[in-house]
Amino acid sequence: MSVTDSAAKAASAPTSRRLTTARAIAEGIAQEMERDSGVVVLGEDIGKYGGIFGATGGLLDQFGPQRVLDTPISETAFIGLGTGAAVEGMRPVVELMFADFFGVAMDQIYNHMAKIHFESGGNVKVPMVLMMAAGGGYSDAEQHSQCLWGTFAHLPGMKVVVPSNPADAKGLMISAIRDDNPVVYVFHKGVMGLPWMAKNPRSIAPVPEEAYETPIGKATVARAGSCSPR
């Protein structure tokens, strides 16, 4: 496994600003939508409301309802729609409001989204991001507060990313959108920088203005050690 120090690079970038994780995610999606007309966003309350955790804020005003689709409350339907769009060459970002709800759409996720590429012998790509919120911290009960990234990590065919800071949140979203096969993108509500949740110093940090990728599958140096080799 190779190593990168993305947080240090973000802090030293000449055009960085301090953003919340929510704003960093939305900016990453917007930059990819500007770059690639095949990138679309769909899910419950992701348009007019901007996502209940702010991850799609401003996208409807910027790109319109043809590319930012508020869907009915049917996880099976809109995840299936996203999978079909990906197979046909688009790059959908689908928001599942809470990770806890994945069970009602398990067939679409596990038997279709994750497997189509392999069932086709590698001939069909599924460039799709399934984005979802995890964690608690604001009395929303056990059906809305679980951290289920480990469950997705055990599904063959899935890449799973869980950003812990705004710089990685933007870079990982861009990497996920550009990936040619499914990426499950899980954000913890506690690092989104939402005004109605407890303050978290990790929820706001320098984020470069330009589009950039945080590589998936590379470790980050969180803190350099001082031990010298024997």
Language model feature labels by segment:
Residues V160, S228-P229:
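Short cationic amphipathic helices and targeting signals
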